[in-house]
């Protein structure tokens, strides 16, 4: 008998965690439809959407509901998020499993304890817990609840398209991908360009996250003082984002407190090899999938040197065609199917 898992996707479609939740379900469906239509997975994976956690629930007929969770999708504060998540679980009335994102860590400062309390509430009601890196496993056990042993399924790296030979832009650019928010590294990257020729522009592929619109003004202010070209693209659709990722001369992901990163994987999925600071998660990523990132020491001076070197040799910012990034969508689908099927029993 086929059991059903409902992937309940909570939040606005443009949010990174929501996009990832959809991509996991898509991979499960495509995996199930592979090989001439034969269903490979014994579990029926369905999908339902909630624009917000207190929206009206669609009818679900499932033995397990799986939700991708970050506190910011459930409330403006961790306390509000806890109330709304708990109310949703009560309304579902069935077993719930979760994938945790953006786990609390010491770099959160004063917010860490309240955020940890939210995640504690989540894991204590969950029939199963997935995280996306060993680094996140350590955060979960050190900061949230040391009794939880999660399943670890790394973030998928989309299928890499054939490398495009674009004509080199007349003026080179350094690019940062994703929402603008504190700690993402936009300002630090722009400042690290101060020794570069003024002809090298800075581009932020994305839009400020809610409440952080001031960061765009800060970036423009720093650029204006040095006379450097700057562009903040705003939200980009898939095709436009793909084109812009290929146009950037030097991709940079100077996010100092990573526990897993969708934006790094987006660069990689397009054949780019971003500059990244050495750290626990980056070491794990490099061990699992060698040759997909360019690692420098975790300080501003090393970033400055790495950018200058990449401007001089832009071929270093493309993944060698012999490298096959892992895990693929089908790898991730198989792992999710295994864990979710186990938790339905």
Regions found by a protein language model. Give the residues of each.
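Acidic donor-binding loop of glycosyltransferase active sites
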Residues: 243-259, 272
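Short hydrophobic beta-strand element within catalytic cores of glycosyltransferases
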Residues: 273-278, 283
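Glycosyltransferase donor-sugar binding loop
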Residues: 201-217, 234
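A conserved mid-protein helix/loop that constitutes part of the nucleotide-sugar donor-binding site
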Residues: 19, 181-195, 265
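Membrane-proximal helix-turn-helix segments that form the acceptor-binding/catalytic region
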Residues: 85-91, 111-128
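Donor nucleotide-sugar binding/catalytic pocket of nucleotide-sugar-dependent glycosyltransferases
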Residues: 124-162
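Nucleotide-activated donor-binding/catalytic signature segment of Leloir-type glycosyltransferases, i.e.
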Residues: 216-242
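A charged, aromatic-enriched C-terminal amphipathic alpha-helix characteristic of glycosyltransferases
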Residues: 298, 304, 311-344
